[in-house]
Amino acid sequence: MAFTEPEVPELNGSTKGKYLCLTICGYRKPGMSEEDYRHHMVNISAPMTKGLMVKYGVKRWTQIHNQSSTRALMSHLFDSQMAIVADFDCFSQVVFKDIEHYKRMKQDPWYQEHLIGDHEKFADTRRSMMTIGWIEEFVRDGEVVEGFKDS
C-alpha cells in the first residue's frame, strides 16, 4: 500500500518571515531510566543529528528533559488555572522555515540508515506525540521583541 500525503488546508494569514516549530512530546522506552534516556538523547542522538539538521535548514533544535526532579518543581507553580503536569519525558523542538526542508532531511539516506534505528533504542515511538505550529515570539534574551528573529 502506497503512502499518499494528506490534503492540507490553506494557511490562514501571512507566513512571511515566520518559522514553524515541530514539537515532539516524547516518552522514553519502557524500562529505561530517566538518566539513561537523557544521556542517550544528549550524548548519542544529538551529535548524530545536529549536522544533518543544519544541512537541511533547521534554524534551532532544543530538547527539554522533564525528569521527576524538575516535574516536582511544578508544585511551586500550581494555581487554579495550572494544576495538571504533563507526564512526557522530553519535549524536542525543531524550528525551520519550510516543511519541505524537514521532509527532505527525513528522506536523506544517512537519516534513513542511522537515525530511524537510533530512535528505537531510546524512544517509545508508539506513545510519543507531535504537533507543529507557527512561532510567535514576544520576549528574547530579556528584551521585548516583535516576532521570531529571521537572521
UniProtKB/Swiss-Prot annotation:
Q: Where is the EthD domain?
A: 30-125
Recorded hits in Gene3D superfamilies, A to Z, give: 3.30.70.100
InterPro entries recorded: Dimeric_a/b-barrel (IPR011008), EthD_dom (IPR009799)
Per UniProt, its applied use is: Notoamides have been shown to exhibit antitumoral activities. Notoamides A-C show moderate cytotoxicity against HeLa and L1210 cells with IC(50) values in the range of 22-52 mg/ml, but the IC(50) value of notoamide D is greater than 100 mg/ml. Moreover, notoamide C induces G2/M-cell cycle arrest at a concentration of 6.3 mg/ml.
Q: Which residues cross the membrane?
A: none
**What are the recorded GO MF terms, alphabetically?**
monooxygenase activity
This chain belongs to the protein called Probable decarboxylase notQ
Protein family according to the UniProt entry: Belongs to the tpcK family.
Pfam families per UniProt:
EthD (PF07110)
Q: What class of enzyme is it?
A: oxidoreductase
Keywords from UniProt, A to Z, are:
Monooxygenase, Oxidoreductase
Highest rank taxon of the organism: Eukaryota
Functionally, this protein is described as follows: Probable decarboxylase; part of the gene cluster that mediates the biosynthesis of notoamide, a fungal indole alkaloid that belongs to a family of natural products containing a characteristic bicyclo[2.2.2]diazaoctane core. The first step of notoamide biosynthesis involves coupling of L-proline and L-tryptophan by the bimodular NRPS notE, to produce cyclo-L-tryptophan-L-proline called brevianamide F.
EC number(s): the record gives: 1.-.-.-
Organism in which the protein naturally occurs: Aspergillus sp. (strain MF297-2)
